Amino acid sequence: MHFLITNEVKKIFNDKLYSQRFKQITDLVSTKLNIDKKRFFECHFVDEKTIQEINKNYRNKDYITDVISFAFDDGEIITPLLGEMYICYQKVVDQASQFAHSFERELCFLFTHGLLHLLGYDHIKIEDEKIMFALQDEILNELKITRNINGARND
């Protein structure tokens, strides 16, 4: 499985670290969940205004959120394109501070969270939330992307 990054905020991703981390996450998820290597998805990094518009137009929720995913699979037709996710740069910055961990950890958490949504995971029901969040933690911990602010990059 591979991905295409679109950066509409021009504040991040000049550093190869994030692309490497995203590839590590994507490769690990592909292996764990046996995802066809030909599948791909798009990840867009956007500002607060853009994500609020997307949230309002497609989810009828008029507020800024951190990540939104649109899975293209409907269960019957499987296309190479899994879907698209949108991550709000400013929410990454704000939430890293709020939760007292690094920018890298928050960014990778939201990337993983959005990817799992593209693969059909959700957290509407408590039992589904436990499964999804346990898988997120397993992936991030295996890659040593932890909540320890001292050991991680904090941009």
From Swiss-Prot:
- Reported EC number(s) for this entry are 3.1.-.-
Location relative to the cell = Cytoplasm
- The keyword Hydrolase is annotated on this UniProt entry: yes
Alphabetical UniProt keywords: Cytoplasm, Endonuclease, Hydrolase, Metal-binding, Nuclease, Ribosome biogenesis, rRNA processing, Zinc
Q: Please provide, alphabetically and separated by semicolons, the GO molecular function terms listed in this UniProt record.
A: metalloendopeptidase activity; RNA endonuclease activity; zinc ion binding
Q: Which Gene3D superfamilies match?
A: Metalloproteases ('zincins'), catalytic domain
One Gene Ontology biological process: rRNA processing
Q: Which residues bind Zn(2+)?
A: H113, H117, H123
| Cofactor names | Zn(2+)
Report the Pfam families cross-referenced here.
YbeY
* InterPro entries assigned to the protein according to its UniProt record, in alphabetical order: MetalPrtase_cat_dom_sf_prd, YbeY, YbeY_CS
- What GO cellular-component annotations does this UniProt entry give? cytoplasm
Going by the entry's taxonomy, the superkingdom of the source organism is recorded as Bacteria
Q: Could you tell me what the cofactor note in this record states?
A: Binds 1 zinc ion.
Keyword rRNA processing belongs to the record:
yes
Family in the record: Belongs to the endoribonuclease YbeY family.
PANTHER family noted in UniProt = ENDORIBONUCLEASE YBEY, CHLOROPLASTIC
Protein function: Single strand-specific metallo-endoribonuclease involved in late-stage 70S ribosome quality control and in maturation of the 3' terminus of the 16S rRNA.
Q: What is this protein called?
A: Endoribonuclease YbeY
> From what organism does this protein derive?
Ureaplasma parvum serovar 3 (strain ATCC 700970)
Gene encoding this chain? ybeY
